[in-house]
């Protein structure tokens, strides 16, 4: 099957964004100063984000912003003020974890496309079909799914599928890990993951080893099959 896919690249800084566009990416995604899963990354300021939106659109590409953490009630109004300048600048969509934030964004920014983050832990077709009622148009399914599961989700829901093709994997299902919060007071679901799974651990006096650090995801050998599955 010949399918046109969107190559979406991460862009943690303006330099990375420009490099991704120059390399041929169809779209980029990045975080702003709040509500992103990488609170300690080199995220863009409001001024830089607006400039990034303009830069990407000049080159005929798309730009999505992450709002992929869990939000508290008091933060919803703050979310409105945070997103408003980007909405006005023409942001192409937001990648969201919190279902309450999805509902809020759909109500206050009705023309803003909303994508379900992998942090939402969509692992089955029923879950993907359920979130359609909130106006979600694209889902980033859990990275642990098989090609067959992705294919079934695509066929039965009609949602766009966005799949990771390379990068680190979480020790737990995305959006479900509490390890960083429990042992370090830094919640991964609030953008503060300290990545304790990357540290060496010693068991029963044996030599310290990377017991919880998974191998990186790499799908280059199965890209045609992934595309055919709907990814």
Which residues does each PLM region occupy?
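Conserved nucleotide-cofactor-binding alpha/beta core module
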Residues: 124-126
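Active-site pocket-lining/capping segments in soluble small-molecule metabolic enzymes
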Residues: 2-122, 140-144, 148-231
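As written
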Residues: 135-136
